């Protein structure tokens, strides 16, 4: 198969322009003034040319300039509309506004956000503000936003619902898909229900989820995700196993899911002997219905579009057309919405589709040498997608899934069965519930198999191997993947007939030429494998040698949340427990901690208390904030039942941890304000053994300024940055602290834009070294032996550094 790659360069140029200009829209006008004339000039030069090669090259460059100019024009038009002056003024003044908006994604439970009542049930979803009201004045707008709000007391919000929400708004980071963040102050009020077709799909999804819940074990929890992309029943343990084994893509509605559905319809059409055009039309209509059923979120719409590319490529009878068609789709989407260029989901959708178009066929033929052709094709599809996406996946998690490919080979063939059979059961539930229940039990079998593969793979030793992060990790993974595929898929030379003399010598030279580039490729792979294996073998010894034996502070890498340990000898304090018990338990095991002398829970958001199960029964004293509801009080009871002394803390409380002194700096006891939620975060400072530290919880800017006025901490060596590095920070407080190290406990690709550029600039201005758990992993601070106050900073993924 010959691939047509002529539009790939244009798509790459358009993507680069979109990525750059979406983060700096103020340059879009100047870019147009440069690119449009360049495109016109090149077009004028091309027309009279007769040399085909030069003509083709200049045409490519002209198309690249025109594509980039279209992106610049799109941003110049869209940027002011995305962020009108009414929104920027409301954000700057922190004014309370009333937003009328349409829900565009399924709400998910969120861990925390500034300004909302603590302890309440909160959700996050994408939406579009259609009207903004303030002070009796209303203005029509069209602003893409991410909304953080209390969950309504009645039915859950659904896609397509129009709501009214009293809220405050903040500008998002430049380049984000959302132009602003909306923080609701009260539960949303429903203004209009979704259209009938969205309501029908929501009812069908609810029926399917309820029926699947009756099935046993992880198979029942996983089935809605495999069939219709509903992962609400997937618990943390199963979710972690799916991610560790590189199977989480099976529960996200992707181009592969859409392709499975359309492929089933095409097969049915072939069985009914329909014409090709009729089969394609039927498949496209089915795809449209599937999109409605699984919720028409932006990511699902993109997946459906990628599946359409595969469908049209296959249906045309010329698979080689798929690459230019994919390139054209990328160009159109990025011109229509340049902010997609920074979306990881879009990147992975494009790469997975490209992998299926380019790699699935050759891999299937290669595997077909040792197994039946149909089985080879089934295995080649997930393998091609995994190989194409892996270089980008290391940006999200700088690890290599050792068993990812075998797990996909084992689970991959079961996924389309679970999808198709589960989807049939879902569609039959309203009309033939008995028949649907029987089919649902059949769908449970492949679902349970996938869950078992995920659990087994995740439990094996070395299931996630450390790898390079950032651009180095992408480049290294891409190079090694390319060399491996080139060696495996390159055709071997045909055996030459027996010859003598000069002909024989020429034949040997030809075979040597075939080996020419393969010898260095094998050498590079062997060197890389040997070096990496050696680093893994030596990592335990290297870690033991580099890890500061007398460390005092350790920030655990537990995702989007806080869990920081303070130590003196064999005495340990833990400030917050993060969102996930398994992640916290792994960190405590790494640090060799089995007992917590002092536990501080700054407030009750899930990203600070969700991991509590990891320490129940291991805590001596717990300092907590004021409880707001029965759920908070039950948490106190669980700690007490586990043997902990639970005390509500406030400013002025003091104590010791071995040779360290600690003091609570916030909140003020008895104050009518800032007692709960982020503004009421219990703030603790430690002093002793040469290091002063302060832990700011999720304090917002107003609370930080109030802390300065009430009990200024003074200069410290280490500060745990507030609220994972959000924008809502007091520059004055960090200037007062003048910390040497700023610990930012934050999750990779967290969706909030944490840590923000504003926070990083604040730290840079006071020469505080920013240490991020999302990029550097576990971070440990110690006092340099004999260093006269110098600190040693050790991080899991960055070499040790010393700070004066």
Where are the language model's segments positioned?
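Hydrophobic alpha-helical transmembrane segments in multi-pass membrane proteins
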Residues: 235-404, 469-545, 626, 643, ...
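N-terminal leader/targeting segments
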Residues: 1-87, 183, 302
């Amino acid at each position: 198969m010959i691939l047509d790659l002529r539009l790939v360069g244009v798509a790459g140029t358009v993507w680069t322009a979109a990525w750059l200009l979406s983060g700096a829209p103020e340059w879009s006008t100047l870019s147009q003034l440069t690119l449009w004339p360049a495109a016109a000039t090149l077009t004028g030069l091309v027309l009279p040319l007769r040399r085909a090669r030069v003509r083709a090259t200049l045409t490519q460059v002209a198309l690249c300039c025109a594509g980039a100019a279209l992106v610049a024009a799109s941003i110049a038009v869209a940027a002011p509309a995305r962020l009108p002056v009414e929104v920027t003024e409301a954000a700057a003044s922190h004014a309370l506004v009333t937003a009328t908006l349409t829900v565009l994604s399924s709400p998910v439970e969120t861990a925390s956000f500034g300004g909302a009542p603590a302890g309440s049930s909160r959700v996050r979803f994408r939406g579009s503000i259609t009207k903004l009201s303030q002070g009796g004045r209303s203005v029509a707008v069209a602003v893409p936003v991410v909304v953080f709000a209390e969950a309504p007391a009645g039915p859950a919000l659904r896609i397509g619902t129009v709501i009214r929400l009293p809220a405050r708004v903040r500008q998002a980071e430049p380049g984000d898909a959302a132009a602003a963040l909306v923080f609701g102050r009260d539960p949303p009020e429903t203004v209009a229900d979704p259209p009938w077709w969205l309501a029908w799909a929501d009812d069908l999804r609810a029926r399917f989820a309820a029926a699947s819940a009756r099935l046993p074990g992880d198979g029942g929890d996983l089935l809605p995700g495999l069939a219709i992309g509903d992962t609400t029943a997937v618990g943390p343990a199963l979710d972690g196993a799916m991610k560790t084994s590189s199977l989480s893509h099976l529960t996200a509605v992707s181009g592969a899911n859409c392709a499975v559905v359309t492929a089933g319809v095409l097969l049915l059409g072939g069985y009914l002997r329909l014409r090709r055009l009729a089969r394609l039309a039927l498949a496209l209509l089915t795809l449209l219905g599937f999109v409605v059923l699984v919720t028409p979120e932006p990511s699902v719409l993109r997946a459906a579009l990628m599946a359409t590319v595969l469908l049209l490529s296959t249906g045309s009878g010329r698979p080689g057309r798929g690459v230019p068609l994919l390139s054209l789709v990328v160009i159109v989407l990025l011109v229509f919405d340049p902010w997609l260029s920074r979306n990881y989901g879009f990147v992975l959708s494009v790469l997975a589709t490209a992998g299926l178009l380019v790699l699935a066929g050759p891999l299937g033929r290669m595997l077909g040498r040792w197994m039946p052709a149909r089985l080879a094709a089934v295995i080649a599809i997930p393998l091609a997608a995994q190989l194409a996406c892996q270089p980008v996946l290391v940006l999200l998690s700088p690890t290599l899934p050792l068993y990812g490919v075998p797990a996909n080979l084992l689970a991959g063939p079961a996924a389309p069965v679970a999808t198709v059979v589960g989807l049939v059961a879902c569609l039959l539930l309203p009309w033939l519930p008995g028949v649907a229940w029987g089919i649902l039990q059949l769908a449970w079998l492949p679902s349970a198999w996938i869950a078992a593969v995920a659990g087994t793979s995740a439990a094996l030793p070395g299931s996630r191997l450390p790898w390079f992060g950032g651009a180095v990790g992408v480049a290294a993974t891409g190079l090694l993947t390319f060399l491996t595929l080139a060696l495996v898929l390159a055709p071997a030379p045909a055996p030459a007939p027996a010859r003598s003399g000069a002909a024989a010598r020429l034949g040997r030279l030809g075979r040597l030429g075939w080996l020419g580039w393969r010898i260095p490729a094998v050498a590079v792979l062997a060197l890389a494998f040997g070096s990496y294996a050696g680093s893994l073998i030596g990592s335990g010894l290297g870690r033991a040698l580099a890890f500061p034996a007398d460390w005092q502070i350790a920030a655990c890498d537990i995702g989007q949340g806080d869990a920081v340990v303070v130590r003196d000898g064999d005495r340990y304090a833990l400030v917050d427990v993060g969102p996930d018990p398994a992640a916290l338990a792994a960190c405590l095991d790494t640090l060799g901690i089995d007992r917590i002398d002092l536990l501080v829970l700054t407030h009750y958001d899930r990203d600070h208390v969700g991991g509590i199960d990891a320490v129940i029964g291991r805590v001596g004293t717990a300092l907590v904030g004021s409880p707001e509801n029965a759920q908070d009080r039950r948490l106190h009871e669980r700690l007490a039942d586990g043997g902990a002394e639970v005390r509500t803390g406030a400013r002025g409380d003091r104590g010791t941890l071995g040779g360290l002194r600690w003091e609570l700096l916030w909140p003020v006891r008895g104050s009518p304000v800032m007692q709960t939620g982020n503004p009421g975060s219990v703030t603790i400072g430690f002093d002793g053994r040469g290091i002063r530290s302060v832990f700011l919880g999720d304090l917002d800017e107003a609370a930080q300024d109030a802390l300065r006025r009430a009990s200024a901490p003074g200069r410290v060596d280490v500060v745990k940055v507030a609220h994972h590095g959000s924008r809502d920070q007091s520059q004055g407080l960090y200037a007062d602290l003048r910390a040497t190290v700023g610990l930012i406990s934050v999750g990779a690709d967290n969706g909030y834009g944490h840590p923000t550029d504003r926070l990083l600039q604040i730290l840079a201005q006071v020469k505080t070294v920013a240490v991020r758990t999302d990029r550097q992993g576990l971070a440990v601070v110690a006092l340099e032996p004999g260093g006269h106050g110098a600190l040693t900073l050790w991080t899991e993924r960055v070499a040790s550094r010393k700070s004066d």
